[in-house]
From Swiss-Prot:
Keyword Disulfide bond: yes
Note: In group A rotaviruses, VP4 defines the P serotype.
Originating organism: Rotavirus A (isolate RVA/Pig/Australia/CRW-8/1987/G3P9[7])
Name of this chain's protein: Outer capsid protein VP4
GO cellular component, one term: host cytoskeleton
Marked site (Binding to sialic acid) residue numbers: 101, 190
Length: 776
């Protein structure tokens, strides 16, 4: 079914970038969050769209499934599984330590009676007696000997449906799999000098780290992910894993690659960051005993320092994220001391420092990759601030300490009145320490964090030392400077392109042939077949699929699935604590939010409408999770999307992610879903409308919301492709049998195609109406 594309996007939406992390930490892990990046910094989007983009921090993420690679001979690293994916029978892998272990693995096809076969093992022709009694599964057998002239013995067979095998060197042993899928387990062979065992592989293979052994076992038992089984995934040489290590000194410029017009330069720099905080203190009106606000605000600091004998002019912009709002109220009288709000940064807060200097590294910082930094930690201690009251002793806010720890670096753009500067944004996480802060002559004491009252403590600046490294694409001519393309321009261009593309997509609805659409809706579209209409290379297609998944991850559909997963988890835990059958039935109905309150249902229409509307929000997700043979709204939506992508002349890899995500959210907004119970049909729409009727007469019957909630939990949910109004019209004008009615209620694609091929105007009008709802 074409809706496979949406399920594939939901299961493969794994990409996370630094801005997602910053927004999540800043909003989800604190309360009363104030985000004030200041007038000089803007990092809403990446500065440009070029190449692989920047590396957000210095953390290396090891891939879960690395490959596929072509057959080769090499010494696999210890503690890594080598996952083998042979396609034909014969020798799959062989390896030896040339002392006391010669080990090979042979693959035998299904249904092989006992026979003698000749295999080439370690350069010798060897005759072995083999068999495979399984009618459906392939058989892997290990053959080994302990002396050069010894005979081979057979060990540890693995009967496999996915036809996958794995080997790992670890802790003086060689580990393999044995048993029968889907219940295969690991076994091992002891050997000396195991780390020097060279292995020759005769099939494509993958590399999986040992800490992901559970995932490796899942692949052995159930097969590789669907995305690995397309013709677009091709194996590459193992040399692709090699990394060219360049010895680099600090404060050095290295030419990584060069052509006639462009060159890649690696800049390594020592760096001295000086910064300070700024604050705003606003006194409230009245008699002078109350303050309305004490808050942080961004500030730019310019300074000079010496780097390798060269004087560097730099400036920094310091801002904070995720502040905590405190208050103090000494009483209700006008002469009682009070502070409506004062900000404090602590463990859930972040400090951002945007840094720029006049060195060569920042002159062409437009196209950047491999960005990394190492910085020291700095401790910031607050000073004292005296609240001058008209009469009485003055309260004093004093103390407070936080330590800034480096937590990542990315590109940013700083704007001034005269110039736009591409700079580096350093992100710091915070920890609190002694001394705590307090307000004298009040009960506020022993609080931790750094308040905004006097964060600099009479210091001119705080200082951090460290280094950074980046690779920048610059003109080969050092006298030419790359024009700055800041993110605002890039985003405005993208919005304009999206606007034009939406108009084109909506106009293409008139050009879709209905019979072809039904055929396309029945195809199992994957990501590569969906996007094949765009002119691009295979590499660009892979990158494009990743970009689509990254954008789709933030869609309403993906968010709903995530929320539903959490709800089901909560329901499962409540089931484990339930003591009655009734409570279990109520809790396990995770598709509804009314299940826990179903016992006190009111008979009013308003209450039933509210409950069915709540259930209807989950029906699309239930249908996606339990795929049926019938056609659904997402099949039509995906087919229309594919057709429009193929017909479009304006779609590009840049605009595709937004278009796919919008289509999943906006195509066919007026949806109705149904569940069938014998001769009774229950329907609920996204707009809260609900009704029940009999199949043979289409006469309405009372709507039992309790029964509907139970059916939604236990029965398949079906898209009402042909709605009740259309069915009644069809019965009144053409007459349909009970079986035809059942087929149309189940959205049987064969029956739909028959009506369309017969040019039935009622069915064609309904499908055309659905196509016209596929608008952006």
């Amino acid at each position: 079914m074409a809706s496979l594309i949406y399920r594939q996007l939901l299961t493969n939406s794994y990409t996370v970038n630094l801005s997602d992390e910053i927004q999540e930490i800043g909003s989800a892990k604190s309360k009363n969050v104030t985000i004030n990046p200041g007038p000089f910094a803007q990092t809403g989007y990446a500065p440009v769209n070029w190449g692989a983009g920047e590396t957000n921090d210095s953390t290396t993420v090891e891939p879960l499934l690395d490959g596929p690679y072509r057959p080769t001979t090499f010494n696999p690293p210890t503690s890594y599984w080598v996952l083998l994916a042979p396609t034909v029978e014969g020798v799959v892998i062989q390896g030896t330590n040339n002392i006391d272990r010669w080990l090979a693995t042979i693959l035998i096809e299904p249904n092989v009676q006992t026979t003698n076969r000749i295999y080439n093992l370690f350069g010798q022709q060897v005759t072995l007696s083999v068999e495979n009694t399984s009618q459906t599964q392939w058989k892997f057998i290990d053959v080994s000997k302990t002396t050069p002239t010894g005979s081979y013995t057979q060990h540890g067979p693995l009967f496999s449906t996915p036809k996958l095998y794995a080997v790992m060197k670890f802790s003086g042993r060689i580990y393999t799999y044995n048993g029968t899928t889907p219940n295969a387990t690991t076994g091992y062979y002891s050997t000396t000098n195991y780390d020097t065992v060279n292995m020759t592989l005769f099939c494509d293979f993958y590399i999986i780290p040992r800490n992901q052994e559970e995932k490796c076992t899942e692949y052995i038992n159930h097969g590789l992910p669907p995305i690995q089984n397309t013709r677009n995934v091709v194996p590459v040489s193992l040399s692709a894993r090699e990394v060219v290590h360049t010895r680099a000194q600090v404060n050095e410029d290295i030419v990584v690659s060069k052509t006639s017009l462009w060159k890649e330069m690696q800049y390594n720099r020592d760096i001295t960051i000086r910064f300070k905080f700024d604050r705003t203190i606003i006194k409230a009106g009245g008699l002078g005993y109350k303050w309305s606000e004490i808050s942080f605000k961004p500030i730019t600091y310019q300074y000079t320092y010496t780097r390798d004998g060269e004087q560097i002019t730099a400036h920094t912009t310091c801002s904070v994220n995720g502040v905590n709002n405190f208050s103090y109220n000494g009483g209700s009288l006008p002469t009682d001391f009070a502070i409506s709000r004062y900000e404090v940064i602590k463990e859930n807060s972040f400090v951002y420092i945007d840094y720029w200097d006049d060195s060569q590294a920042f002159r062409n910082m437009v196209y950047v990759r491999s960005l990394a930094a190492n910085l020291n930690t700095v401790t910031c201690t607050g000073g004292s601030y005296t609240f001058a009251l008209p009469l009485g002793n003055y309260p004093v806010m004093t103390g407070g300490t936080v330590s800034l720890h480096p937590a990542g670096v990315t590109l940013s753009t700083q704007f001034t009145d005269f110039v736009s500067l591409n700079s580096l944004r350093f992100r710091f996480r915070l920890t609190v320490g002694e001394p705590s802060f307090s307000i004298t002559r009040t009960r506020v004491s022993r609080l931790y964090g750094l308040p905004a009252a006097n964060p600099n403590n009479q210091r001119e600046y705080y200082e951090i030392s460290g280094r950074f490294s980046l690779i920048s694409l610059v003109p080969s001519n050092d006298d030419y400077q790359t024009p700055i393309m800041n993110s605002v321009t890039v985003r405005q261009d993208l919005e304009r392109q999206l606007g034009e593309l939406r108009d084109e997509f909506n106009s293409l609805s008139q050009q879709i042939a209905m019979s072809q659409l039904i055929d396309l809706a029945l195809l199992p579209l994957d990501m590569f077949s969906m996007f094949s209409g765009i002119k691009s290379t295979i590499d660009a297609a892979k990158s494009m699929a990743t970009n689509v998944m990254k954008r789709f991850k933030r869609s309403n559909l993906a968010s709903s699935v995530s929320t539903l997963t959490d709800a089901m988890s909560d329901a499962a835990s409540s089931v484990s604590r339930s003591s009655s059958i009734r409570s279990i039935g109520s809790s396990v109905s995770a598709w509804t939010e009314v299940s826990t309150s179903i016992t006190d249902i009111s008979t009013t229409v308003d209450t039933v409408s509210t409950q069915t509307a709540t259930i209807a929000k989950r029906l699309r997700l239930k249908e996606i999770a339990t795929q049926t043979d019938g056609m659904n709204f997402d099949d039509i939506s995906a087919a229309v999307l594919k057709t429009k992508i193929d017909k479009s002349v304006q779609i590009t890899p840049n605009t595709l992610p937004d278009i796919v995500t919008e289509a999943s959210e906006k195509f066919i907004p007026n949806r109705t879903y149904r569940v069938i119970n014998n001769d009774e049909v229950f329907e609920a729409g996204m707009d809260g409308k609900f009704f029940a009727y009999r199949v043979d007469t289409f006469d309405e019957i009372p709507f039992d919301v309790q029964k509907f909630a139970d059916l939604v939990t236990d029965s398949p949910v079906i898209s009402a492709i042909i709605d009740l109004k259309t069915l009644k019209n069809l019965k009144d004008n053409y007459g349909i049998s009970k079986q035809q009615a059942f087929d149309l209620l189940r959205s049987d694609p064969k029956v739909l195609r028959e009506f369309i091929n017969q040019n039935n105007p009622i069915i064609r009008n309904r499908i055309e109406n659905l196509i016209m709802q596929c608008r952006l």
